[in-house]
Amino acid sequence: MTQDLEFLKQVLSVPTKSRQEGLMVEFLTNYLKEKNYDFYLDAMSNIYVTKKTSDDVEYFPCVVSHTDTVHKLDTINVVQEYLPNYQGEIKLSLKAYNNMDEPTGIGGDDKCGVFACLSLLEILPNLKVAFFVSEEIGCVGSLKADKTFFDNVGYAIQFDAPENWMVTQYCYGQKLFDEQSEFFIKCEPNFKEMMPNFVLESHPYTDVYSLRKLFDFSCINFSCGYYQYHTRNEYVVVEDLYNS
């Protein structure tokens, strides 16, 4: 992953809230235009991106994130601090404050996912990316996902779990993948390397729940380094995000 701290700060500084996602959608569309990526928006403002550099691609990997947060719209000044990860180690972290120096909630849930998707789009030769609206109020965007976009998707990965040790196997009661599947057998060594204490978990809904419900491909979701999510004191441990 492109370890671009300034770009990460830029992504995290975009204010966005469920049903008030215009600034994030604008940020993403401007970025995608600047990079000349092939993308489109649907009527809900879900964003669908395809990067194809090989002619023989039959099925694409797909990464997804959501463009909303739970935090009210406010000025976001991203500040570097040193804060604990799950293991209690003090790490370089990012936290958000408004112009009155009050914590606002940085919205790593799921701006960390947005950053991860954009970073992978930069480095992988063939990839599909979906940015869904209003996940926090019931997967509103992903439940209306454009089915034609996913016709040639082989699997979907979401970056939308807190801290640095969680892998979502069940999401809102929906089984996302089989432990004995070729998909997870290929995933597992990467988790053991970058997330050595990972645990398979059952989590509330996120967008891969919708995709697994709608389509016949494996999905997975895992930790991407945000802590104290849905609170004003939310922060992002940079190393954990890069590892994801």
For each predicted feature, which ranges?
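Conserved active-site and cofactor/substrate-binding residues in soluble primary-metabolism enzymes
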Residues: 3, 19, 23, 27, ...
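A non-catalytic alpha/beta surface segment that caps or lines the substrate-entry region
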Residues: 10, 16-58
